[in-house]
Amino acid sequence: AFRYRILGIGPWERRLRTLIEQYQLEDVVEMPGFKPSHEVKAMLDDADVFLLPSVTGADGDMEGIPVALMEAMAVGIPVVSTLHSGIPELVEADKSGWLVPENDARALAQRLAAFSQLDTDELAPVIKRAREKVEHDFNQQVINRELASLLQAL
């Protein structure tokens, strides 16, 4: 069985709390709100999966590549997210995490159900590739060294 912990605050908070109460999900969905980074780190350490179902806002607003996904991948937490904006640049579908279409609750539920059936041997290579992706492609020190090498070659 899954337990969900939704961190942060935002425009959907009131609606989510209402839905949790309406569907009597208080025993499986927790919304602790905003937490300082050291508490978020402790919560990540306890997580089995990191879920970030990003969607395009009604005004067309999109986030780029969420740092929260990078952080989860870097510390070895499997990620499930959406085919949204720059996320596929970070999460390679079925290789370094799992992606579902935006606004597709059924696909998200199916992905989480499938995730729950994976064993450690199946997760290990995905977690390894995710960490390698973040360490190589999104590590500021690596990027700076590569840029310095390019500039020296000019």
Locations of regions flagged by a protein language model:
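Nucleotide-activated donor-binding/catalytic signature segment of Leloir-type glycosyltransferases, i.e.
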Residues: 15-38
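Short alpha-helical donor nucleotide-sugar binding micro-motif in glycosyltransferases
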Residues: 34-35, 42-47
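Acidic donor-binding loop of glycosyltransferase active sites
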Residues: 45-61, 77
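Short glycine/serine-rich donor-binding loops of glycosyltransferases
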Residues: 62-69, 87
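Short hydrophobic beta-strand element within catalytic cores of glycosyltransferases
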Residues: 69, 74, 78-81, 91
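Short acidic/histidine- and often glycine-rich active-site loop of Leloir-type glycosyltransferases
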Residues: 81-94, 98-99
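Conserved acidic donor-binding segment of nucleotide-sugar-dependent glycosyltransferases
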Residues: 93-94, 98-105, 114-120
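A short, well-ordered alpha-helix in the C-terminal region of glycosyltransferases
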Residues: 114, 121-137, 146
